[in-house]
Curated annotation (Swiss-Prot):
Biological process terms in GO annotation: translation
Keyword annotations from UniProtKB, A to Z: Ribonucleoprotein, Ribosomal protein, RNA-binding, rRNA-binding
Similarity comment text for this entry: Belongs to the universal ribosomal protein uS17 family.
Species, as recorded: Shewanella loihica (strain ATCC BAA-1088 / PV-4)
Gene: rpsQ
Record-given protein name: Small ribosomal subunit protein uS17
């Protein structure tokens, strides 16, 4: 069985933790009654081994094994610097 590793792209909200970042993932959801598209954000904690990210950076993260209670994503690359 081959599972595709999930990758997401988002904006770094916080890098105050050591070797960890908080990434905001934005998605658009259609309102069930009115049909308007609404922005929804999900905050994900990710592992940043080299502490290279700053707040405002656009990054790519991928899913991995659980690294702590809240971290199960790791940094792949920094797409654009803030």
């Amino acid at each position: 069985m081959t599972d595709k590793i999930r990758t997401l792209q988002g904006r770094v909200l916080s890098n105050k933790m050591d070797k960890s970042i908080t990434v905001a993932i934005e998605r658009k959801v259609k309102h069930p009654l009115y049909g308007k598209f609404i922005k929804r954000t999900t905050k994900i904690h990710a592992h940043d081994e080299t502490n290279q990210c700053n707040a405002g950076d656009i990054v790519t993260i991928r899913e991995c094994r659980p690294l702590s209670k809240t971290k199960s994503w790791t940094l792949v690359e920094v797409v654009t610097k803030a």
